[in-house]
Structures are given as C-alpha cells and as structure tokens.
Amino acid sequence: MDFPAAQPKPAADGKIIYYPPGVKETTDKITNDEVVKRLKMVVKTFMDMDQDSEDEKQQYLPLALHLASEFFLRNPNKDVRLLVACCLADIFRIYAPEAPYTSHDKLKDIFLFITRQLKGLEDTKSPQFNRYFYLLENLAWVKSYNICFELEDCNEIFIQLFRTLFSVINNSHNQKVQMHMLDLMSSIIMEGDGVTQELLDSILINLIPAHKNLNKQAFDLAKVLLKRTVQTIEPCIANFFNQVLVLGKSSVSDLSEHVFDLILELFAIDPHLLLSVMPQLEFKLKSNDGEERLAVVRLLAKLFGSKDSDLATQNRPLWQCFLGRFNDIHVPVRLESVKFASHCLMNHPDLAKDLTEYLKVRSHDPEEAIRHDVIVTIITAGKRDLSLVNDQLLGFVRERTLDKRWRVRKEAMMGLAQLYKKYCLHAEAGKDAAEKVSWIKDKLLHIYYQNSIDDKLLVEKIFAQYLVPHNLETEERMKCLYYLYASLDPNAVKALNEMWKCQNMLRSHVRELLDLHKQPTSEANSAAMFGKLMTIAKNLPDPGKAQDFVKKFNQVLGDDEKLRSQLELLISPTCSCKQADVCVREIARKLANPKQPTNPFLEMVKFLLERIAPVHIDSEAISALVKLMNKSIEGTADDEEEGVSPDTAIRAGLELLKVLSFTHPTSFHSAETYESLLQCLRMEDDKVAEAAIQIFRNTGHKIETDLPQIRSTLIPILHQKAKRGTPHQAKQAVHCIHAIFSNKEVQLAQIFEPLSRSLNADVPEQLITPLVSLGHISMLAPDQFASPMKSVVANFVVKDLLMNDRSTGEKNGKLWSPDEEVSPEVLAKVQAIKLLVRWLLGMKNNQSKSANSTLRLLSAMLVSEGDLTEQKRISKSDMSRLRLAAGSAIMKLAQEPCYHEIITPEQFQLCALVINDECYQVRQIFAQKLHKALVKLLLPLEYMAIFALCAKDPVKERRAHARQCLLKNISIRREYIKQNPMANEKLLSLLPEYVVPYMIHLLAHDPDFTKPQDVDQLRDVKECLWFMLEVLMTKNENNSHAFMKKMAENIKLTRDAQSPDEPKANEKLYTVCDVALCVINSKSALCNADSPKDPVLPTKFFTQPEKDFSNDRNYISEETRVLLLTGKPKPTGVLDTVNKPLSATGRRPYIRTTGSETGSNISVNSELSSSAGNRSREQSSDISETGVSENDENPVRIISVTPAKTEPVKNKEINSDQATQGNSTERGKKRTATASGTENIHQKAEENNADETGPSLAAKTRRGRPPKPEPQGTTAKNEETNKPPVRGRKRAAASQESPGSLEAGNAKAPKQQDTAKKPAAAQRQIDLQR
C-alpha cells in the first residue's frame, strides 16, 4: 500500500511522531471534536495496515506509543477513548505477536483501558456500536489478551474483562457478538496456565438463580463457555468444591454459600464438569449436620430427578447413599426425599423398584406430613401415567385411607377417587389400566364403615363427584350407577346402601324439623326442636361447632318463609335432581355474605344440603334404571363390555332398585316401571323375583287406585309366590299383599285356608314355604287368624311336626352343615319354631296358655340339646340348628314386653347359655342376633349381660366380636340417654351400668359354677365379670364406678329370687358379688366415693332387702382374692372348669380351641389362653392346642407346649351367610390324630387317620371337650357314664317319664355328679409328648 508522505511531529521524548497524511498533530491543545476528527483518520490508517507492512510499522511505531499515553488513556471523551481503543487493538494486530509496548505496567493500563471501552457494547442502538463491535471482533480474532499471560497480575485484567462481557451481554446482541465474546474468553481459559478462583467466580456467578433471572443472556454465555472449556476448567471447579465441601473453607469464594445451586446448574450444563465433585456429595450426605444433609438431599433430588439425568445409573453408590436419606433421623430430610420421589417416578420409571421399598417405610412414618406427601407423590405420578406406579405403591395409598390422621386419610381417599375417575370412568388408558384400579371403588365405599363422620361425608362426596358424577346426564349417570352396583363387592354394596339409608334418615330429620316449624310455639315444641337439631348436628363434621351453626340455621328458617319453602322442595319426594341443584344454589346464595369470604356457617349448611339433596335419584333416573335392566333382560345391553354378565347385571339391578325403593318410593310410581317389575316376577331367578316383590311392597301403595291393570296382574302372582315360591318370596308376597291392598283380609284368607288344610309332615320339603306364609299371615292379621292358627299350632306344628322325628340324621359327628345339606325335616322344624314366634308376636297376649306353653317347648328344646324327642335319631348338626332356632325364638319373644314379663329366670338362663354352645356357628349367629336386637334397643337390658359369658369363648375372634358389641351397645345407650332426658324408671332399662345385677345373677347360675370356693371356677367368674366391667369402667361417668360397687353391695343384702330359700344358691350369688367388688375395687380408685343415688335392683331376680338382715361376711378368702387379682395362670393345658363333665341343664360343653380348632367351620386365628388377664385382648404367648376340631363330637387333644404367637383379631361381624360359607374353608386340614368319624367337615380326609389312632383314641363321652383321663381299672365301671348324657329328664322317680307334651319340656334335669377325676401326672406327660 502506498502512503503519502507523513508529516513528522516531535514527540515529548524527542522522537519524531509520524501522522498519516492529512492528519495534524494531536495534542491536548486542541478541542475534543478536532481530536476525534484526527483520530478517525488514524483509525482508518491502522485499520488498513497489515502485518507485512514493515516500513509502515516502523514509521508509525512512535505514533503507536503516543496513542498509549496518558492523554488518550485518561481522556474524558468517550468517543476519543473508543477511537484510541480501536487504534490500540489494530496496533496489537499489526505488531503481533510482539506488542510495541515493553512496559508491563503500560500493557496492563492499555488492556484495562480497552476492557473499559468494551462496556460500550451494551447499547446496540448507539451510533458508535459498529466501532465497539469492530473493537471486540479485532480483539477476539487476534486473541490480543493472550499477551497478558506474561504479566504478573494478568488475572486482574481477565477478571475485569469477563465481568465486563457478562455485564454487557443482552438479548439485543446477535449471534456474532456472543461468538466473539466466547472466543475471547475461551482463549484466555484454554491457553492460560489455569483459572484462578476469582476468574472462576466471575463465570459461575452468572449461574446463581438470582443472577440467572436478572440476565438470561449472561447465563447462556456462561453455559456455552463452560461447555466449550470443560476439559480445562473441570479441575478448577473440582478444586473449588473440594475447598468448600470437604475442607469447609467457605472464605475461598463469595460463592461458597451457593455451592449447591452451582452444582445443579453445572450438572445441567455438562455432568463432566462435576466428575470429581459427586464423591464429595456422598461424603456430605453423611454429615452430622441435619441442615447440611437437607441441602445436599435437595440438590441430589434435582440431579437424580431431572428428566435427562442418568446419574442414578452412572453413579450407583451415590444413588444408594441418597436412598438411605429416606430413613434419615431429621424430619425435613425425610420429607424432601419423599417429595423427590414424585419427579423421579415420572421422569425415571425404571427407578420405581428402588423407590418402592423406601416409600413403603415412609408411608408408616410417625410424621403426618411425610405420610401425606407419600400419598401425594404416588397419586401425582399415577395421574400423569398409571404405568408409573406399581400395585405396591397403590397399596400404600390404600393403607393410608385408614390413617389415624384425617388430613392423610382425606388425601389418600381423594387421590384414589381421582385415579378411579380418570382410568375407570373415563377409561383414558384402556381396559388394562381400568382393571388395575378397579378395586378403588370397593375400598372407598368400605371406608363408610368407619366411625368418623368426616370419613362418611367424604365418601358421600367422592361418590357424588367421582364414582357416579352427579353432573352427568340422567341416562349416562344411571348407566354408571347400574354397572358400578353390579361390580361392587358385597361389603361395598352394604356400605352404599347404608349411605343412602343415612342420607334418607337425615332428610326425614330435616322434614320433621320443618314440620315442627309449622306447629304453634310451645315448650314441648321447643324441646322437640332442640332434640332434632342435636340429631342433625351429629350428622355434620365437627358436631360441637355444628350445633351452633344448626341452631343459627334454624333461626334463619324460622324468620324466612321463602327459605323454608326452598328447603321443603329440596326434601320433598317429588324433587327432581335438577330442581335439587337449583334449590341448593338458591339457599346458599341467600345465606352467603359478600363481606365474609370464608364463611364457616355457610360451609356447614352446604354440607347439610349436599347430604339431603337428591342429586342422583328421581323419577327420571328410576325410569332410566328400569330401561337399562330391560335391556339386560332382552340381551341388548352392554353388560359384557362393562365386564358384567347379564345375569349379574339383572340381579344387581333389581337389588339396586330394591334399595332405592326404601329411600325413594315415590319415584317408582309409573306403569312403565311396574310393567318391567312384573316381567322380573316371572323370571326363573328366585332372587330377582324376591327383589321385585319387595319393590312392589315398598312402592305400591297407590297401585290399587291409580293402576288397576297392574293390580289385576300382580294379585295372582303374589298368591302363587305365597303358596309355592321360595320362603323369602312367600314372606315378601304376604307382606306386599298386606301393605298395598285394601281388601287384604280377603286376599290373605285365600292364601291361609288352602295352606292350612294342605299341611303334611310326611313331605317336609313342601312344608317350608307354607309355614313361612302362615306365620307371617298370623303375625300381620292376628285378629282374623289367631284363632284358626291355634288349632294348626296345637294339632300340626307341635304334635305332628316338632314332637316327631320321621327321618334319621346322618351320624357323621359334624356339629354344623351348610344350608344345602340340612335335611328338609329340620328346615321345616326351624320354620315351625319361627311360626310359633310370629303367631305369638301377632297376638301380643300373655294371658293365654299358648305363650307359656311355647316357652316351655323352647326350653325343652334347649335342655334336650335340640333333640326334643330324645330318640337319638337326629344328627348333631341338625340339633345345632334347632338349638339356635330355640334360643333365637326366646330372644325374639323377649323383644315383646308382654312376653318378656313371663319369661322365667330359668328360661332366660337357658337362652343365655346358647352363646356358649359347643358349635361355633351357633355361638356366632346367636351373638349377632343378640347384638342386632340390643343395638336397636329392642331387647331388655338383662340380655346384654349374656355377652359376659363370651369371656369363656374358646375362639379369640368371637371374644373380640363380643367386646365390640358391648362397646357399641353401651355407647348407643349412653348417647340415647343424653339425647332423651327421661324419668328414673326408664333409666332402669337403658342405663348400661344396670346390667351389673343381671350379670351377677346370670353368673351365679352358670352351670360351670358349682363350687363357690373353687379358685379355678372363681377365676372364670372373675374373667366373665371383667369382660363386661372393663368396658363399663372405661370412663367414670357420673361416678358410675361407685354406683356399680353400690349395686354389688346391695345385692348382698337381698336373696336370690329364683331360689330364695336355698342356701347354696344364695352363697353362690354372694360369692359372685364379692368377686365383682374385688374387681371393681382393684381397677378403680374412684369407687370408694359415695354413690350419687341408690340403685334399684330388679325384683324378678332379687328379693326386697329385709330390714334386720345384714351380710358382712366375705365369701372369698384373702388368699383367693390375691390369686384372682394377680392372675396366676392355671396349670398349662388343663382347663378344669371347661373340661368337667356336664353338671347342669342347658349347657353345651366345648373346649378351648386354637385358630385351627373351629373345625373346618370358619377361618379364625385364635389361641388357647389361660384365664388370667383380659381374654378379649390377650397379649401374652398362649399355649396352643393343635389337632382338635371344635365342632368334632369326640375330639382328641394334642397339646403343644410351644408358645403360640397371638395374632391381632380384627373386630368384624360375620353374618349368618358367612357362617355357612365358612364350612368350606381349609381350617384344620389334617390332624395328627383324631377319632374316626369325628371331623366336622373334612371327614374323608380324616378317615385315613382313623386307623392310626389306636385303642387309646376310643370315642369319648362329651362332644366338643375332651374328658379327663381316668385311672386304670375304671374303664368297665364307667362304660355306662361314657354314654352321651340324656339332658332335660326329671329327677329320680320321674326319670322314666317321656316329655310327650309341652308341659314335659318344662322339667329340669338334675345336676350330674362330677365323675371324671383329675388327670394323673404321668398321663399328662404322655399327652404332652403326643
């Protein structure tokens, strides 16, 4: 390039400065504008020069040095500085690789100067931006800053440069600017000897969240820079984290407090940046500082959980160490670990297996928040994709639906409901996913069995929003309900039925409240209204607060007539679902307060409205259900598609309609609905027909007047069902006729007369339905049929049917058989007993001899163990059925006050002893019937005392069930007394504490209690007393402990009304009183206070105290008292009281059994336990008897001395259907040794063992309990006594008489002498070895 001759100017140091042609000398003497003008020409000159122009380079060297003078570097004018910087950049380019500046200080000043000029890059709209860009481009291209490596303090320049570039980068810069910046910085990092901490900080600071949010472009620039220089910068990063994490030198950097944020960002940029850091994190996970562990867990949770992370597979030791933090002692650490699991499950399904076990443990964490978050974690992942959560994880959520904390239960229930709606209702992931969560509907409805009102309300809400969404169109909603009901398990169906029943009950309470508003104000009206408000409040969450809100709502109702009319419409039987929705919104709008965003009063009212509003069922809905069922009958429905067979759909549909007929009867009243039901009546399925009759019975009150065509078709069908249908159909048909027809007398007579004439005991299979029909007819229309029935009862039922055994039962030793195996004759006899009861219940007359005769007959049935004729023709299982029927019959009659009066104490005791029957099913079913009647307050209080005898039950589950029954009954009675203030005389029949005298009297007459001073017998008495007293003494309400003590003391001042002049009877009574006093005194320190009132004793059981009679005697010795209280166990394996021979009437013997001993009847875990301690809640190791069937006739005892671990017994009720099903279970399969022919169900399996038993296992005397071994030489002597005892015969001279009539059944049997002797020690040794 040719330059014109330059104009030389003398420099300050004497050297001549050559300026480019046309450029005058640039000094501080000229203006800034002139300086700029001249510098622009200089810039142009240097810009055009290249490195090869040696002459020019030499010529302009002084100028280059001059431009680095203080005048230019410190010039206040930014344009001057920019132009100088551009010149200097070009000078470095031209003179590269050597700079013309030899002074290190000057070089440092120059580069700091250039760096400062780079700040001008910030404003892209500046007219000078292109020059700034040129400056950056030039520096980056030439790598000018690499010159600084020679400087000692080059780091200061680099730090300033990096900070400048990161501060100026912004979103208005194009890609070229960013690339030049990257080139500039990366060359410094990669070509230097290392990166100092300060320089590293200048990069890393841009990754901190606060800075990252302020300048996203700086973050991106740092990210790309780190990626580009990863190999060079990684050791520097590792050193930094090592200093901070391992050595704890937080002072090395201002970023020390942000290390975990930095690790997270660096890992996202490139995991290789942290190759050396990860092991340091494993070290930190084990820190003693909980907060430090928490910070590391938070960090690693993000690292492991991020979507593209493969850290868990790349670094297994760190992953395993991290999983260990799920079990950290520090609660926040465990909480953080659980929260992480959700992201991990969603982003890394392959790690679910590793997480499952840890989540299982945390689902039982003592901290509520952690259990809650486990649920949230699993449900969140499940809602994203069901395949992300395995069955085990869903199982954890299922468990938590029963958590002790409401927040956790609610989360679990709502989570499962959402999954069900998504995958079952909407089928978003196909049939397999729907099948995977199909159990949810059952589980959620099962929760309705919980006692908490919050649980019940949430189940109702879930049902209305998730299981059968109420906002669906009617047809869709009913289809959803129809197939849901068909696919529910039996317990879920019961829960759903109970839910509708509770809602209907609450509707009726609100209806009654509105009726009270219509009545004139009075004191009685106010009291009734208050009681009704308290009842309504109990059906709402937090009953305490609810009472105040309900009272307030009641005031509003009283003042606002329009609101009352809206509420009346809402609960009226004709209210449609759409109307209900409008009413609820209207009432809520009226009660809303705009000034009060959170209104607890309104929330409570909404709860009430949601419970009573008919959001699912109305006339249109019932019509839609019936159409669906018709389609199932015709075979045109989608039954198979919905996973239900047509038969199941039809049966379930009818059952559903039957339940709804109780709660919404008005909605059924249409010809179309009834036509469909008539079609069901003609179907072969007995259950379907039975349900259809029930629906007619519940809903058909207007059929006669409004639908004559339906009436004329229905009558002959009902007649046919009453005569020849199944027993259940017959019962429903008779009740249906009585309920819906005005000429019921004529209709019933047309059934009664032909049936009563055609009774034939020789064909028992044809007797059952007629006996059912006749019994219900005589109960429903006693005035018309009581007299004609009397002759049927006397001539046929008693004389011909009950007093004769026409067939011989199967002698297989079973104590129970399934329903289908029971002989028709016994089924007929059971129905005959029920007929007697129904006939008497209809008459309600205790003046006639019929009631007494029937009670004597039933007593005779119990005394004779079910074999009324005592001809030994009836089988053991049939005898069990008849004993159960007789005991249940007495209990049923006792529910009618007029018959309760004439039931003698002896008959009551016989009835009570059924709960100690040798047959498991008899005990089970009788206890359920007893509880059902007591809980409805139908039975007198004395019958609750029967549960005390359950302490003797050999099966733990039965004891547990009895205890639950007691808890329920006592709480119901106490609640009833609170809600219904009453006079003292009524308290006698309701106050639970008044059960004590009945219990004492019952135990004093226990046939097992023969020797008042026998310690083992007294221990049994004590166990029975404590079984009841423990529940009664849970709380000392109104000084009840002292009251019970006073009752026991007062009994000692009376005599036994049953046998007032018999010293032994009175001694036994007083002894039981002393045992009761002993127990009460030992268990309560509060019983020594004075009783607030003097208890009244029942005169039926105790005489009036005599004025001059005092009874200070102690009937149990101090030694005995100590033995009873210390609970010294009886000798292992020997239960003297249980094993003694039969000693009184009405007692069926049985043995203490283990879980395998209920004899193939039912699967129950139970152990033989000593009588010490509370048998309902044994916690100790029990001696386990194996190889005995409780229901075997002649069981053989094989005693194990290994302590058996007790299993917790769930307190559940088992209904009679389950009892029969239980016979098919696999309990007690093969026994080590057993008597031939004694196995209750698995007889064939046992026959192979019969030959192994040998002569020593000959048939024993007693069913159900092993006899005591006798000394040698007594075998012949006892051949007679080894025969089964004949029970119920009269004493001595009268022993040959046969009970041929009702009167004979009233005879008492003598107490037999205890002929069995105690086992010898040697014999016991043999038993144990066996």
From Swiss-Prot:
HEAT repeats lie at residues 387-423. Residues 1160-1171 have a biased composition (Low complexity). Keywords: Cell cycle, Cell division, Mitosis, Nucleus, Repeat. SUPFAM superfamilies: ARM repeat. GO terms for biological process: cell division; DNA repair; mitotic sister chromatid cohesion; negative regulation of DNA replication. Residues 1216-1225 have a biased composition (Polar residues). Its main location: nucleus. Coiled coil: none annotated. GO terms for cellular component: chromatin; nucleus. It is found in: Nucleus. The keyword Repeat applies. The keyword Cell division applies. Residues 1138-1330 are annotated as: Disordered. It comes from the Eukaryota. Interacts with the cohesin complex. Binds chromatin in a cohesin-dependent manner. May regulate sister chromatid cohesion during mitosis and couple it to DNA replication. Belongs to the PDS5 family. This is Sister chromatid cohesion protein PDS5 homolog A. It comes from Gallus gallus.
